[in-house]
Amino acid sequence: MTGCDSLTDSKVWMEEVGKARMAFALFLTIQALENIRSFFVLTEEGVFTGIVEEKGTILSVGNGRIAIQAGKVLEGTKLGDSIAVNGVCLTVTTMTKNQFTADVMPETLKRSSLGSLKKGDGVNLERAMAADGRFGGHIVSGHIDGTGIISKTENDGNAVWVYIKASPVILNLIIEKGSIAIDGISLTVAKVNDVEFAVSVIPHTGKETTLLEKKTGDIVNLENDVIGKYVQKLMGIKNAAGSVSQAERDNKLMDWLRG
């Protein structure tokens, strides 16, 4: 075999591997979507889209209960319905025309930013999506994966870059141009490295949500793309504290292809 033949074979092989990766990714995505659909149908869990409907105001937090002033999200809402508060799915326990309360477990307060909220703080609110609702963002379960810390913000024309430091467990599932929910807001990741990621916030998002009201050092709730989490599980890659190498992902792919 000549060197040219070897090079050609190598290119063909790489093209075939690329096609196999795409086919495998499609297969995993379909499986993930089916699992997600089954989960929400069987458990009757609420599902959100990351499109914030309004900004509410904290009235009180304490004794395992949170009270929030709101308006739009209470339209058509009944006791027992789900509302995402800064990305955390809570169940409405009492309500009036312009406010509602929800019970919050101590563990939820500890693992999310809800525990640091105080009277007068703004929060992002979204009702669970109706079965015939329009899907504007991405699938958000309301069960956050952890929190991040805003490390810096930078103005860029009419947009604002927001940089967020997060744990390796969360960063391991973040990809550029992928989706992530930050305080319940569906956003696209523009940059990511080993310690932080960044999103670009347009004026409309800044106006309709609380994100640009945050300052450096503030804590935000983070939920990775649920499809990515299902794909990772289907591939058998544990979301360990360290990043998973591309070589390991390739090995998983080839093992699956060999059957």
Sequence positions of predicted segments:
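Conserved loop->alpha-helix
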Residues: 42-259
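Short hydrophobic targeting helices and cationic amphipathic motifs
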Residues: 7-10, 28, 40
